Amino acid sequence: MTLQRPWTGVVLAGGRSSRMGQDKALLPWHGRPLLEQMQALLRQAGAQHVVVSGNRPEYAGIADVHPDLGPLGGLASVIANAADATTLVVVPVDMPLLSAALLGKLLAPSQHRCVAFEDQMLPMCLRLDASVREALTVLMAGAASSRSLRALQHSLQCHRVTVTASERAEFVNCNTPEQWSRLIHENPD
């Protein structure tokens, strides 16, 4: 499941977790924090480097240059600090059912600058070139309503990969204690 070119994995872990009531990145998943689970997943999928978006010194996290701008702001900060990166695979911290095999579908050889799964913003693959960086800069300078992963994917004409029903089940994420409890109950250690 390796890409011909090296790639960098990015875990988006800078959110406030306000609906969860506690830091989602540190919730225990099969014996380790969710953040570590997602880092391990990216390494398993073949990432040469894995970086964390968010003010997390204990994980060498990259703090947002402009706080409170959501996932797009975190991604912009990572890209600004990863000048040598040519390809990023971006995952949220709260999607522990993702598999390396599914991420591999994003990494299939492609000429697309942006690749994501149908009906999903994340995970996504970005092949960084001047046009991707410019699109990100324009969105970050624009109105707050345009600062979203959806807007970035739209501006890059993101290619959508189809998934099976069983693969779709891997996109479960958790934003509330009830969702987390259900996920733990359905996926015991």
Curated annotation (Swiss-Prot):
Could you tell me the EC number(s) of this protein?
2.7.7.77
Question: Which SUPFAM superfamilies would you find in this protein's record?
Answer: Nucleotide-diphospho-sugar transferases
Q: Does the keyword Nucleotide-binding apply?
A: yes
One GO MF term on file is: metal ion binding
Look up the record and name the cofactor or cofactors this protein needs.
Mg(2+)
Q: Which UniProt keyword terms apply here? A: Cytoplasm, GTP-binding, Magnesium, Metal-binding, Molybdenum cofactor biosynthesis, Nucleotide-binding, Transferase
The kind of enzyme this is, by top-level EC class, is transferase
Coiled-coil annotation reads none
**Primary subcellular site in the record, as a coarse category:** cytoplasm
Q: Kindly list the positions annotated as binding Mg(2+).
A: 94
Q: Where in the cell is it found?
A: Cytoplasm
Give the residues the record marks as binding GTP. 12-14, 24, 68, 94
> What processes does the entry annotate via GO biological process terms?
bis(molybdopterin guanine dinucleotide)molybdenum biosynthetic process
- Reaction(s) catalysed by this chain's protein: Mo-molybdopterin + GTP + H(+) = Mo-molybdopterin guanine dinucleotide + diphosphate
- One Pfam assignment: NTP_transf_3
Any Gene Ontology CC annotation: cytoplasm
All disulfide bonds of the chain are: none
Top-level taxonomic group: Bacteria
Question: Entry's InterPro entries?
Answer: MobA-like_NTP_Trfase, Molybde_CF_guanTrfase, Nucleotide-diphossugar_trans
User: Which HAMAP family did the record assign?
Assistant: MobA
**Function description:** Transfers a GMP moiety from GTP to Mo-molybdopterin (Mo-MPT) cofactor (Moco or molybdenum cofactor) to form Mo-molybdopterin guanine dinucleotide (Mo-MGD) cofactor.
Domain remark text: The N-terminal domain determines nucleotide recognition and specific binding, while the C-terminal domain determines the specific binding to the target protein.
Record's subunit section: Monomer.
Family to which the UniProt record says this protein belongs = Belongs to the MobA family.
Protein name stated in the entry: Molybdenum cofactor guanylyltransferase
What organism does this protein naturally occur in? Xanthomonas euvesicatoria pv. vesicatoria (strain 85-10) (Xanthomonas campestris pv. vesicatoria)
Its encoding gene is what? Answer: mobA
